[in-house]
């Protein structure tokens, strides 16, 4: 059993039922819907295909709606792409003008108020660098420091500038409402700056009458500075190394990755490492050695999941990429699991009742040589608390809620299943015997550690731990 999870971005390369079944069988756990591209109709069709493929394979698949976020972009160029050369002057304006080699509009009307003389402006993921010479009304006059080709709708980054854009654009709000109605299991918020950004997402969710976990994409320097508050406020984190490396020193990104992973584990929050993990496999059938090391090190650092972007959405080898990533992940896990139960920060102890029960369950399973950890969970929190200790035993999560089952596809080592509601601990134990026998995971007589809440079915009441020897019931 592979413990770490694989998130795959969907796109034209996998837009058939057969391809999605193959992706799931290859190891996809979470399907990412990138709302920077595609129409709502296209996303709905993909969603329906994912649910059908999940049902056919009998495997839980989480659906992640990734919102575009308030990305600042250029407008359009009248005659196609233009090439800027070092020393050229170039104007970015909030006026509606046809773009050319000397001027182009921007989608962000607040730009002139957010920059000043000497500020750095980056275009196209930092490939083109400009420096602000002056601001005259709606026009920002710049000089080209590093030239290159720019074209319609390329992104603009403003390192160090306090950009006054809302956490959610109008498009994001529309996309979020659609994704919630569609049935997504989790949402990712782009360009998070601080903990307050999650409030805007929750406000829309409450209006729609449906809350799902919100993932903070850490890709702004402000989010790095506020990482402890961001991790505490959000339900999970994505280390979005692409945009982060544009505005934040490239050489410091690996350390940010390690710090975020450690912080998320300490807080029992799932963490995804993303961007260029298997980039060469967009066009090649094998990854580079550096990519293999990157994936393995993310797992050794403690990531819950690794993510594929263009590799799976538009790449030539999407299924092969997932299979290869899965092999690399498994090899890294062998090293990780050989070290035994993973403590959190030395001296760090759980602060909650549920956290204490989870730690005790992992330690007892370790001491007794238990075969598995069984978590009855309504919200998924019990399973996530068990997950952070990276126990050698698989974690089987039983829940009555299909949404919780799908959300747990993001958590390390957790295999989640929907089961009927039980009202007593005796019924709970009987259910364990029946379900484990049905799954064929363990043998009669094997020791498992059960964690649950009493009374059953009430979120946040984890207070029970039981050592159980599986019976032959149901086999």
Please annotate each region the language model reported.
Residues 1-475:
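Non-catalytic helical/linker scaffolds that mediate oligomerization, partner binding
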């Amino acid at each position: 059993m592979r413990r770490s999870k694989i998130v795959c971005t969907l796109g034209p390369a996998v837009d058939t039922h057969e391809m999605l079944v193959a992706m799931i069988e290859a190891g996809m756990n979470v399907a990412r819907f990138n709302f920077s591209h595609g129409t709502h109709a296209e996303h709905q069709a993909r969603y329906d295909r994912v649910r059908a493929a999940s049902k056919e394979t009998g495997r839980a698949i989480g659906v992640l709606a990734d919102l575009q976020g308030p990305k600042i972009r250029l407008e359009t160029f009248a005659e196609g792409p233009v090439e800027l050369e070092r020393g050229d002057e170039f104007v970015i304006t909030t006026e509606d003008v046809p773009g050319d080699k000397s001027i182009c509009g921007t989608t962000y009307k607040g730009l002139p108020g957010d920059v000043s003389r000497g500020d750095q402006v980056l275009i196209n993921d930092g490939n083109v660098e400009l420096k602000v010479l002056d601001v005259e009304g709606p026009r920002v006059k710049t000089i080209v420091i590093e030239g290159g080709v720019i074209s319609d709708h390329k992104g603009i980054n403003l390192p160090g500038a306090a950009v006054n854009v809302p956490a959610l654009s109008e498009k994001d709000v529309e996309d979020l409402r659609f994704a919630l109605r569609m049935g997504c299991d989790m949402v990712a918020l782009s360009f998070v700056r601080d903990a307050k950004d999650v409030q805007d997402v929750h406000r829309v969710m409450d209006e729609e009458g449906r809350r799902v976990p919100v993932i903070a994409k850490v890709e702004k320097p402000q989010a790095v500075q506020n990482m402890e508050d961001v991790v505490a406020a959000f339900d999970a984190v994505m280390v979005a190394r692409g945009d982060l490396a544009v505005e934040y020193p490239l050489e410091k990104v690996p350390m940010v990755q390690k710090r975020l992973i450690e912080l998320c584990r300490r807080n029992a929050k799932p963490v995804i490492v993303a961007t260029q993990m298997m980039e060469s496999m967009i066009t090649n059938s094998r990854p580079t050695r550096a990519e293999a090391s990157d994936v393995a090190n993310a797992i050794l650092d403690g990531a819950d999941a690794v993510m594929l972007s263009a590799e799976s959405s538009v790449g030539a080898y999407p299924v092969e990429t997932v299979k290869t990533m899965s092999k690399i992940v498994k090899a890294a896990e062998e090293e990780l699991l050989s070290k035994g139960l993973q403590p959190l920060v030395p001296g760090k102890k759980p602060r909650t009742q549920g956290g204490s029960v989870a730690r005790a369950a992992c330690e007892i399973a370790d001491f007794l040589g238990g075969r598995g950890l069984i978590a009855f969970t309504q919200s998924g929190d019990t399973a996530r608390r068990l997950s952070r200790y990276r126990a050698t035993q698989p974690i089987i999560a039983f829940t009555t809620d299909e949404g919780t089952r799908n959300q747990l596809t993001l958590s390390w080592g957790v295999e989640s299943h929907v089961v009927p509601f039980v009202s007593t601990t005796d019924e709970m134990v009987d259910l364990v015997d029946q379900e484990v026998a049905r799954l064929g995971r363990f043998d009669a007589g094997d020791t498992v550690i059960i964690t649950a809440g009493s009374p059953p079915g009430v979120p946040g009441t984890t207070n029970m731990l039981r050592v159980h020897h599986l019976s032959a019931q149901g086999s």
